[in-house]
């Protein structure tokens, strides 16, 4: 068995490629079942965010397993192998484990140390458990990754003042407003007519940061108006006008700054739509949805400026240098957590021998107990039989405790294998079945 990860991220692929591989929650079960149906895949879980799509697996054979996952991604995206493969990465065993720890800690994020990725890893664990695509190995690995992410944020300064995709989007709007006025600095949004399209988690964060940056009011649109009203109720100090998504044309005609973050599979704004509108002002669009909510053809229109998640690099790079030093603190934690998991993984090599040893001793115990009880005669009560049986089981457990602990203890693989051979020889244990 081998742990492997195959995927792509903002580091390896532009948004126009990433959006083709995005797997929304409503189709996650189907994707997991498809992957689990491959005879190479023993366990699987999927991390799908606006900046990455990563498939973590336990496979029978590393090369064949990685090939099977890559084939799935090609079929899912509709991209030819020559178009997709340059953007894919894959890691095997210790590199896969170390990569996941970095992801959960926020060290592989566009926004270094951002906290939202930890929630997304937790969601990956929940979906994998709900859809029963994970087994003991990935359960252990992903649960430890979540713990590692929490530990990094509590034991280092990396999480202090960390920005998110949403806060970076608001800063990008401030920066572009300043640049339009000939200033290379963040400008207030107080005079802007601002709209947010969507009422999910990213939109909640947008409202939070817009309020913090002095925004005077927001038009909030959502397919379900009630959800927009529920969200706006959490921001009593920010004037929010809730509207249904059907009012999108009105929003685009009247607002000067529009953020989009919906779960739509296709763009909800394109050039043909904007051409039909009588806009009152310059329109700045900032799209943090993946798949994208704003079609790329709008950039050719006069009076329209459009940005997507890949454009956030411009503001992220302004505060990354200071955070790089904080990341070095986190690396120490990641190395320790990776080592702990790999030690646990190595200890699994002893499990078949331990199980066969336990079964051998249990058979001896049961046989000898039966002989003893048969000699006791009918005067030996049921209660006394239970006491003797418990005694025999306790003796076996005491005998097994020290050798089992030693076989599972961290040690060089060569030393463990030698110890396993000695135990198998001493107790004449049958060899384990080879994994197919």
Swiss-Prot record:
Q: What is this protein called?
A: Glutamyl-tRNA reductase
What keywords does the record list, in alphabetical order?
A: Chlorophyll biosynthesis, NADP, Oxidoreductase, Porphyrin biosynthesis
Q: Give the SUPFAM superfamilies listed for this entry.
A: Glutamyl tRNA-reductase catalytic, N-terminal domain, Glutamyl tRNA-reductase dimerization domain, NAD(P)-binding Rossmann-fold domains
Which top EC class applies here? oxidoreductase
Task: Tell me what gene encodes this.
Answer: hemA
- According to its UniProt entry, what is the function of this protein? Catalyzes the NADPH-dependent reduction of glutamyl-tRNA(Glu) to glutamate 1-semialdehyde (GSA).
Involved pathway(s): Porphyrin-containing compound metabolism; protoporphyrin-IX biosynthesis; 5-aminolevulinate from L-glutamyl-tRNA(Glu): step 1/2; Porphyrin-containing compound metabolism; chlorophyll biosynthesis
Tell me if Hydrolase is a UniProt keyword of this record.
no
